[in-house]
Structures are given as C-alpha cells and as structure tokens.
C-alpha cells in the first residue's frame, strides 16, 4: 500500500499492474456469459473506458467481440461531490441498439447501487431482455435491490472513506485509491475557489 501526500488522507491500494490483473479476472468471469446478443455498456465516465478494456481482453484471451456502448448517468462530480440526489440519466447518450439484447453494465465502483439500479431499470424499459452488472471494485453500503454479477475486487472499508478509480483518459494512470471524505471535500472546495 502506497501512501500519497503526508496527511494519511489518501492511500493507493492497487497500482496499474494490479488493475490489469483485476481486468483479466473480470474478462475470465464474463467470457462464459457472452453470446452474440451481448453488449458491454459502460456508464460514463469511467465505466466506458473500462468496458473498452474489458472488450479488448475478451477478444484477445477468449476470441469474443461484444459490441461496446455507453450510457451517461450523473450523480457525482469528478471530485466525487454529490451533484444530484438521484442519478440523472441522459438516455440520448446511449449509442447502441438494446432491443432484445443481453447487456453487461460496467462501472468503476459499486457502493449504494443507485446509479446502476437506475441504469438497469432504464435499459430494461428500453427493451433489453437480460441485464448483468460488472464493477472494477465494490464496497459495503448497497441500498438498492441490485447485486454485482462480476467484481474485480471487494473492499471492506469504513463509511468515511471513498474509493477513487483512476482510469485513463480521465486520469494519466490506472490505479485504485482510498481517500478520506474530508480530503475529498477539501479538494472539491479548493476546485470551487479556483473557478
């Protein structure tokens, strides 16, 4: 575990190599469930590049080539500040056909499940026949009737800590960091003052 900064408010728990291992494991777990009707749908922002990385591994290691799409939902800002009480869905951002399809929804972190639950309900109402979920990591705190079908890593962390997945192109490296919520708030407030 690498400590960033000097105030113990942020800890890197998985580096780039570790994230690649988690993605390989996810691909191995997902592969038996992929059919010709399967599409990977990444939740923007970080879920989309994760879906693309997962699709690359499915092709390279398993000879599978599922279509990759994206869906935009917004609940938190990039600094993890709460923007909307309920996740906001931009259904026009969905860029693939979903009627009668098996969808695997992909996002970086499963916490309360509100974002993924709302996405799954929207896609089911839009015609998807079977929906599964995949996450790079998960933590306790689920509030919705949802489960993770595929998870790279599970972390049992205290409620006042936040999991942040660094995923290019939004960050310059791959990694998973734990940050204390006070540090997240401080960074968010500093960003507001800079505007």
Residue ranges and their predicted role:
Residues 1-195:
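PRPP-associated nucleotide enzymes
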């Amino acid at each position: 575990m690498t400590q960033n900064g000097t105030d113990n408010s942020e800890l890197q728990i998985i580096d780039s190599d570790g994230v690649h291992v988690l993605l390989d494991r996810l691909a191995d777990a997902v592969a038996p469930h992929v059919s010709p009707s399967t599409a990977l749908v990444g939740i923007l922002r970080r879920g989309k590049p994760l879906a693309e990385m997962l699709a690359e591994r499915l092709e390279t290691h398993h000879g599978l080539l599922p279509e990759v799409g994206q869906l935009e939902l917004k609940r938190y800002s990039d600094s993890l500040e709460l923007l909307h009480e309920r996740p906001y869905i931009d259904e026009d951002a969905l860029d693939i056909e979903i009627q009668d399809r098996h969808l695997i929804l992909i996002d970086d972190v499963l916490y309360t499940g509100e974002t993924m639950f709302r996405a799954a309900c929207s896609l089911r109402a839009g015609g998807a026949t079977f929906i599964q979920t995949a996450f790079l990591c998960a933590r306790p705190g689920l509030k919705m009737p949802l489960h993770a079908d595929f998870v790279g890593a599970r972390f049992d962390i205290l409620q006042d800590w936040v999991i942040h997945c660094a995923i290019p192109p939004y960050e310059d490296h791959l990694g998973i960091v734990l940050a204390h919520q006070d540090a997240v708030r401080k960074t968010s407030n500093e960003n507001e003052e800079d505007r």
